[in-house]
């Protein structure tokens, strides 16, 4: 399979999408949302095949949870698309403007990026999220999902293609690479004549491979160790609720809690509270000081090298006792704090130190790490959570899928 023709078709579609009206794009999105619900039986049947094959292949519970669709999740995906409809279309909006001394009116106007290539793994919802956000912003997209989601994605792509046809938008606006051959990923990463940005959504290995092999700009994100530090001044009862929510609400999510750091002055009180609340679900991986205070835990083991660098994506939690906020920050710097990190504290000084010192895409004071999400941030769905510093950072919504062009208007002005 040669992806060159797919790239050419996407580039052609991108030119048409760039001038599509907001009403036309919203029409396509409304059809996608409605048909997701109307075709739920077929979509869920296809997803059941993927789940069955995933179990046979020995996928972890975390991966199976990411792969799973049910009526509730499908309705949520449809509603996310409807939320995108309600958002302002950034394309064509002015960022700023001024009048130069020579009389020229100069402005910066938002424009689509062009063609976005997205490589992702066992998350069928990403197929719809990407398609919706790219369509809203006038971008064409080339999608490559994992083999684990093959049957689910085939049904979802049918919904998208039906919507494009009914809204009179080019079929190549959203294309899907059906074959799971990794060689096709390598091809996609070299289509710099046609593709303007690559977004990998998966583990560290996928991000590394894209970064090292792509001739197209790559957005790195989604991977990072998420921490919560419980300071000595924190309200421990309220902190307990936040820690539990961050860990167990959806442990397979990239913004779920990986490592809990506790100030040594409150560890003797707080860690037994954690054990009592969470030990029926969570396996603790603890360094010696923490383990000594968690004697009642039913599932606990000693932390070994590499544990605090692990994104668990499961009901496993690293635990460590630290001397103060500075040691907590130092730990985060060493152990890949780049995604979502939080401090529980009633100290303004410590909260500001944390905000200014932790280099993550999203930092929180007295809030769960689970909030790093496009919908939670009011962005609609998201194409990714970027953990790099250039172009976009954190949940990438509509504006992050645009660039800008300079627009100069004058009265037949020539440069002197």
From Swiss-Prot:
Molecular function terms, GO-annotated: glutamate-5-semialdehyde dehydrogenase activity; NADP binding
Q: State whether keyword Protease applies.
A: no
Give the UniProt keywords, A-Z: Amino-acid biosynthesis, Cytoplasm, NADP, Oxidoreductase, Proline biosynthesis
Q: What reactions does this protein catalyze?
A: L-glutamate 5-semialdehyde + phosphate + NADP(+) = L-glutamyl 5-phosphate + NADPH + H(+)
Under which main EC class is this enzyme filed? oxidoreductase
SUPFAM superfamilies linked: ALDH-like (SSF53720)
Gene3D superfamilies (UniProt xref): Aldehyde Dehydrogenase, Chain A, domain 1, Aldehyde Dehydrogenase, Chain A, domain 2
Compartments in which it is found: Cytoplasm
- The reply on keyword Oxidoreductase is yes
> Function of this protein?
Catalyzes the NADPH-dependent reduction of L-glutamate 5-phosphate into L-glutamate 5-semialdehyde and phosphate. The product spontaneously undergoes cyclization to form 1-pyrroline-5-carboxylate.
Q: What is this protein called?
A: Gamma-glutamyl phosphate reductase
> What's the source species for this entry?
Vibrio parahaemolyticus serotype O3:K6 (strain RIMD 2210633)
Source gene? proA
